[in-house]
């Protein structure tokens, strides 16, 4: 992992926003120009070949290059590069609007939640049926195992940075979001969710937009469910 920007000073008033990125040149300008004041984007380039890193730099984002491919690898690299007390994760494909970050981050900043996840309120065409069905099945398993009232393992989430580091996250694939929830619940975290709009993404999906990608994510999450019994 390498970074091309000096770390900013952590502050309770600033939230680092980690954006795992793989070939999102078409979406990044929209995402980064809508980043609200007080939110500092960290774009983790995970092997892009379309100039995503240069576009991110041109829009003022800190860029971290993570050569090991994998969603969890990119998230972990962003976590290590972040410095703020509270951090957020979100997709870089314009399916989520950075202007909704306040909805997800405020309860964690205020100390009323330890992990806040955005439950996707999907617009037509935003969420393929196979991905939605897989997500609903996974959410039911999480509810049974943790007692939480989670309806969606959503890609926009906020968490205290040091508490996340304490979880000793190990998954470097698509099991990362589930590992965070299960380990956090085991430690007694207050896990909540708020609805956020979910739009059709810009460009071609690498995961949920294909049956193959959904199956690959399901494989990783199934492994996490078995390992964290």
Q: How does the language model describe each region?
A:
Residues 1-33:
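N-proximal low-complexity "stem/linker" segments adjacent to membrane-targeting elements
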Residues 26-30, 50-59:
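Acidic helix N-cap motif at the loop->helix transition within catalytic regions
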């Amino acid at each position: 992992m390498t970074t091309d920007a000096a770390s900013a000073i952590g502050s309770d008033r600033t939230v680092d926003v980690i954006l795992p990125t793989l070939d999102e040149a078409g979406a990044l300008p929209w995402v980064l120009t809508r980043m609200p004041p007080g939110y500092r984007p960290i774009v983790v380039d995970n092997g892009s070949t379309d100039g995503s890193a240069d576009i991110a730099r041109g829009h003022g984002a800190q860029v971290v290059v993570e050569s090991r491919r994998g969603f969890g690898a990119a998230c972990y690299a962003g976590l290590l590069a972040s410095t703020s007390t509270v951090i957020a994760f979100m997709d870089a494909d314009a399916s989520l609007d950075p202007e909704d970050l306040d909805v997800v981050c405020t309860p964690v900043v205020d100390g009323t939640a330890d992990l806040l996840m955005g439950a996707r309120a999907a617009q037509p065409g935003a969420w393929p049926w196979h991905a939605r069905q897989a997500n609903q099945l996974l959410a039911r398993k999480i509810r049974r195992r943790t007692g939480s009232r989670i309806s969606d393992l959503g890609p926009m989430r906020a968490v205290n940075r040091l508490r996340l580091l304490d979880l000793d996250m190990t998954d470097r694939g698509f099991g990362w979001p589930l590992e965070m929830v299960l380990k956090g619940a085991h430690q007694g975290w207050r896990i909540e969710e708020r609805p956020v709009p979910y739009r059709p993404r810009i460009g071609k999906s690498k995961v949920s937009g294909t049956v193959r990608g959904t199956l690959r994510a399901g494989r990783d999450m199934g492994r996490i469910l078995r390992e964290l019994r």
